[in-house]
Amino acid sequence: MTDCQLAAELRGIIRRRRQKLGVGAQSRAARELAKKICILPEYQSARRIALYLSSDSEIDCRFIIKAAWRAGKQCFLPVLRTDNPKAHQMDFVSFTPGSPLGFNRYGISEPTKGAKIATSALDLVIVPLVGFDRDGHRIGMGGGYYDRAFEFTRMQKNGVNALNLPVLVGVAYHLQEVLNIRPKPWDVTLSSIVSV
């Protein structure tokens, strides 16, 4: 079995685990996640935060978004580029309480209007994932969108953010943790992972 086949099989297993969580458990986890994120020094000092709107039983970020708005922080959401769908690229667009939403080609909610921000101008990025390990490696949905958007962060060495790059924090349920993920050369390593 190839690495790609193994990753696809692992994605399926973890997604099925996630989908078995009841609505109540998902809501409690989302609230607990918001509490954990909001006490992080990286969150407290951040002015521009990228998040996501959950789909496919991903852990929900809406409580983090609401807390960020109350704290006067700017929120941004990923929007898939439509000019070349095969390129698997995305931009981040401002997200406010009144932002109109639509669905992208994967059925995920995203803003239909808003100001774009350069990924390098973000302070904190809350990253969705399917699986993770303790070394900050993640398995995403397989499209490579986050790896492409944040490939410039590979300059970070030994956890030092000397170039004032965005801090990438993966968020997940505990049940999404796996023992070891073999990263590919293009994979972006997360700064940390917060799980509940």
Predicted regions and their residues:
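Short polar/charged helix/loop
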Residues: G142
